[in-house]
Amino acid sequence: MTFSPIPRIAIPALALAVLAACSSTPPAPPAPTLDGVAAVAAIRASGGAASTELDVQPIRDPQVDDLRLDAERLETAGQYEQAIAALDQALQLNPDDPALLQERAEAALLVKDLAGAERFARLGIERGSKVGPLCRRHWETIAQVRQARPVPVEAPGESVADARRERDACTIAAPARY
């Protein structure tokens, strides 16, 4: 008696087809849990200058200042996308202004754009002072982004605590004046 090879192949193939139908795609990572308004308030609070602290302020371009004021007004009205557009226009005029980059990072947080917020904050760190209130705001922005990530990055120097240590290192007392 001879057996056909088809049944021997058909049963494992059928079993594989059934198992494949049971598989599912991995679940999407959870959406970031971020209260943008609260995060921006915490960032701005971290940038408050003490009277005993060194705080350097650059000379401002009046056209850029007008756009920054427009963005501030739009943000207050809850029109975050329009505020971002005004800040982007200002950045076209002055792409290296660390304060402007920080304001753009904060605007990105308001629309829950974590990658954009971190990118603009890092640009501000690269192009700005490594001390003072603005430096603290850059690092607090990065801390807020890291805190809001659904899955924290497991790499040395990439934790919320690391960002907060960097933020605290930005505070330097002003030189004594005699």
Predicted segments, located by residue:
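Sec-dependent bacterial lipoprotein signal peptides
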Residues: 1-22
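Terminal, low-structured helical/coil segments at or just beyond the last alpha-helical repeat
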Residues: 30, 139-178
